[in-house]
């Protein structure tokens, strides 16, 4: 996606350890026009896919997932990183965050993810694939089906995409970062 790649090159910032900061247009302050274009592209790429639910994990995946859900006229469910006291009937799994260097127990209500659901997972980043693996676990525990996974940015050098594709999962990434060596952003 050309507009996204140009924006990453113009406004993205690189930090040691393979961190790409895009908080000025994707995951802290958001550019709603760009986010709409991102959602339109995901909808185009998954147009022939049988989906009845869009899913993400809080917090940075919520905006693109809502835009995709809006365009597809489908409900959006996000896995929570903290169990609400009001949630009784839930599925849980553990997810390691590369950026925050810690693990979270994430949960989703069985009322919103269940057998027969055909899920499209949308998130901001794909690095090592840990969040994606957690979502796969939740989907499997629910008896639902994972129809595909869409990521705004994939960091190819961290191989999460390789893992998912080798597992037979359909992965669509709108911008693929080949390298952040010497803090130079190289996009495929």
From Swiss-Prot:
Compartments reported by the entry: Cytoplasm
Binding positions for 5-phospho-alpha-D-ribose 1-diphosphate per the UniProt entry: 127-131
Keyword entries, A-Z: Cytoplasm, Glycosyltransferase, Purine salvage, Transferase
UniProt main location, coarse: cytoplasm
Reactions this protein catalyses: XMP + diphosphate = xanthine + 5-phospho-alpha-D-ribose 1-diphosphate
Pathway: Purine metabolism; XMP biosynthesis via salvage pathway; XMP from xanthine: step 1/1
The protein's assembly and partners: Homodimer.
Known role: Converts the preformed base xanthine, a product of nucleic acid breakdown, to xanthosine 5'-monophosphate (XMP), so it can be reused for RNA or DNA synthesis.
The family this protein is said to belong to: Belongs to the purine/pyrimidine phosphoribosyltransferase family. Xpt subfamily.
Protein's recorded name: Xanthine phosphoribosyltransferase
Gene that produces this protein: xpt
């Amino acid at each position: 996606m050309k507009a996204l790649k140009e924006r990453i090159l113009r406004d993205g910032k690189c930090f040691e350890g393979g961190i790409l900061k895009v908080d000025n247009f994707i995951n802290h302050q958001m550019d709603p026009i760009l986010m709409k274009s991102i959602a339109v592209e995901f909808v185009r790429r998954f147009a022939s896919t049988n989906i009845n639910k869009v899913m993400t994990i809080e917090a940075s995946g919520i905006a693109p997932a809502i835009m995709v859900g809006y365009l597809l006229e489908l409900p959006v469910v996000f896995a929570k990183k903290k169990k609400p006291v009001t949630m009784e009937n839930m599925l849980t799994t553990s997810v390691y965050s590369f950026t925050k260097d810690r693990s979270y127990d994430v949960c989703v209500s069985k009322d919103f993810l269940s057998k027969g659901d055909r899920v499209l997972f949308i998130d901001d980043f794909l690095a090592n694939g840990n969040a994606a693996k957690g979502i796969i676990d939740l989907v499997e525990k629910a008896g639902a089906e994972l129809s595909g996974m869409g990521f705004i940015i994939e960091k190819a050098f961290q191989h999460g995409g390789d893992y998912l594709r080798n597992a037979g999962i359909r992965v669509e990434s709108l911008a693929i970062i080949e390298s952040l060596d010497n803090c130079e952003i190289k996009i495929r």
